[in-house]
Amino acid sequence: MKPPPPWAMGLALVGALALHTASKDAAHVQEMLWLCHVATAVMAIGLLAGWHRVMAGGFILHVGFGTVGWLLDVAATHDTTVSSVLVHLLPLAAGVIEVRRKGWPRGVVLPSWLFYSLWVLSCHWTTDPAINVNMAHGAWGPIEHWMGGVWLSGAINSAILLVTFFAADVVLRRLTRSRSVALHSAPS
């Protein structure tokens, strides 16, 4: 079976985001600022515009933070919705398809990590502390008693994410070595 074209996957991601946003009431629409949802939007932009490196940046944000955070939340709360499952799994499928098609580009880790770090800071200043989007106001509930204040928690999260992003980069590079070599050695 032939994989869907990038534009179709981009539109599917936009549709999933719209569906999930529609499921939020006014008090919880800020939850759409969680990095996983922003990463989905970044992936959609990359897929629709044909910017592979942008799509890859969104994908590594999902692999390194979004999916792990979502799975931990589902495990802790025993609660999710159909739109949440869709908006978390569809980007993974689209990312895998596109990375298999075009390989894994170089230079994705540090820009993605900086984006994550700046996004969390912006959420600290713009979101309701009660919702704690991206743990911008404190550590995740189940481990809050082990962490220091918000800034120590943020620094620890940022360091963990940097390691996770580098590990994902190594794995994705190895899994797509032949395509990545072809991508980087092809004439412009």
Language-model segments: residues:
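Aromatic-anchored segments of alpha-helical transmembrane domains
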Residues: 13-22, 61-73, 114-125
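Membrane-interface transmembrane-helix boundary segments in multi-pass integral membrane proteins
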Residues: 128-168
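Hydrophobic cores of alpha-helical transmembrane segments in multi-pass inner/ER membrane proteins
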Residues: 38-48, 89-101, 153-171
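Membrane-interface capping segments at transmembrane-helix boundaries
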Residues: 168-185
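N-terminal membrane topogenic signal
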Residues: 1-11
